[in-house]
Amino acid sequence: MKALVGQVQVELLLFLRNRTVISFSLLMPLLMVVFFGYLNRGGQAEGVSYSSFLIAGGIGMVVSSAAFENLGVALARQRDDGILKRLGGTPLRAWTLVGAKVLTAAVIILTQAILMIAINVLLFDAEITGSPLWGIVVLLVGIFAFTTMGFALAGLSRNTDAATAAASAISLPMQFLCGTFFPIEEMPTLLRHIARALPLTYFVDALRGAMLAGGGPWEYAKDWMILLGCLVIASVVAVKTFRWE
C-alpha cells in the first residue's frame, strides 16, 4: 500500500509539472463547457435545461481525454523512453504501477467533475435532480472501464506516434458525437449510428440518467452491460499486451 501511495504521488507530480497536458486535458474541457453553456444558456435538451444536460457530457469528455490522450499516450511514451524498462528493474510491481496510474486518473477526473458541476451550477443554474450516489457509482465504473481501454490502447500501439494517432482517432469523435454537447436524437442518421457504436455514448447516458433521473443499473441495463463488457474485454487485452519495453 505504501508503494502504491508513493507511486500515485509521483504520477500526480509528473502531471502537474506538464503544463501542456494541464492546458489541454484539464483546462480545455472546462473551457468547452463554459463555451457551450454560454452559447446555449436558457435552452433545453431532452426535457431538461441545457446546463443540466451538459454536466454529464462534460464529464464524459474528461473521462475520454484522461483515458486515451493522457494515460494511453503517456504510457506508450514512457515505454519508448525506457522509463518503464527502468521501473521494471526495480522492486515496483506491475499491479502497483497500473493501480497508481488508474488512481491518478481517478483523482484528476473527479477533480474536473467537481469543477464541471460547480461551473454549471454557479454560472448557468444547472440542477442535479437525480441521485448523486448513483452518479458517483457510474462515474467510478466509467473511470475503470475507460482507463483500462487506455492501457489496452498503449499495449496495442507499437510506439508513441501510433498511440497518439489512435488516441486522437478514438477520443475526438467520442467527445463530440456521444451525446456530450448535443442530444444524439438530433443528429443526422449516420452520426447517430456512429454514436451508438462508441462506448462513451453509454457512459454519458447512464451518468446523465443517474444525475438527472436517479436511474440505477436496472433502468439503464444496456448502458451498464456495455460498460462492464468493455471493462472485461479491455482488461484481457491490456493484460496480454502490457510490456515494460
Positions of predicted regions on the chain:
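Membrane-interfacial helix-loop-helix junctions in multi-pass membrane proteins
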Residues: 42-47, 127-129, 175-233
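Short coil/turn motifs that cap or connect alpha-helices
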Residues: 93-94, 183
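Transmembrane helix-loop junction
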Residues: 37-41, 61, 77, 86, ...
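Transmembrane helix boundary and interhelical loop/hinge segments in multi-pass membrane proteins
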Residues: 15, 67-92
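A short amphipathic helical element positioned immediately N-terminal to and/or at the very start
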Residues: 1-16, 207
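Hydrophobic alpha-helical transmembrane segments of multi-pass membrane transport/permease proteins
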Residues: 14-42, 51-70, 111-112, 170-175, ...
